């Protein structure tokens, strides 16, 4: 399995080494990256190419991975589709609704959604494996409402305010970059898409008035390294992303979601509560549990993920599970993955619309946008 990558940052290095562990026949035969900071993770002797086009033509890959910054994704995915190679792209897929519709056109013209896999890794987590089983068994009944949050620690929030991800034109915004995972799994749980969204938020923590007063106090805000287009000070950042946000989403099924995020949460968590007509599910990725309870109070499931595979590696053990599933898929041992590129595109549209609502102060209706996306016939 000959693999090449556009981008060799920390995420690329981690996923590629995890994939190689799951699939020993993987051979990384080329990379394109003007600033290959984490090249040691895939091997310093990996052939370097001057462009994606040269790499796709010269390396004869079986799999082409897109790990470049978000604003480059559409063009890099386009090159892979046009070259006829299987593509894997890191989330989020693209940075605007217009780019999403252009990608839909490209996929429709180049073999459909199976041509491109996506790294929406939370779908692979044991939490979601077990929750899907509860949903399939009908333990929750019809989904009525959800509440959820992703609250990240100050060291991680500071990374976003220092890194290239601080600029919406480069990343698509914080909600798209970081919380598209979460929006995707709630689309999955409701088995539908948001039709109306509203949002409020801004920046109140990472501002000059809250800057640390000493070098010792400042250390926590530099724990996570940024390597491209970065600034040194999260509190005097030129970034335009939020550090707190609340969103309200209404789904095609009539279910609703209240979602919150905060980038300055010392005791971080990533939790969810799903209320159905016949039961409920409550869990937390960070704190490692999932409980399913019937409407008569009977505890139907009580999963503890604080030991074993779920606490190993990144994303609560889901990276290893994702790479194991991708290995089976590429070997022809399975015919589908838990998440598709179209799922990622739909989550991305929802995240972008939420930010549109926050910026305009108005509710955003997605009916016309879904009609445009559906016109490409990708959902089969």
Regions found by a protein language model. Name each.
Residues 1-43:
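N-terminal Rossmann-like dinucleotide-binding module
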Residues 58, 63, 69-70, 74-123, ...:
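Beta-strand-loop-alpha-helix segment that lines the small-molecule cofactor/substrate pocket
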Residues 180, 260-269:
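Glycine-rich phosphate/pyrophosphate-binding beta-alpha loops
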Residues 203-253, 270-343, 376-380:
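C-terminal glycine/acidic-rich active-site capping loop/insertion
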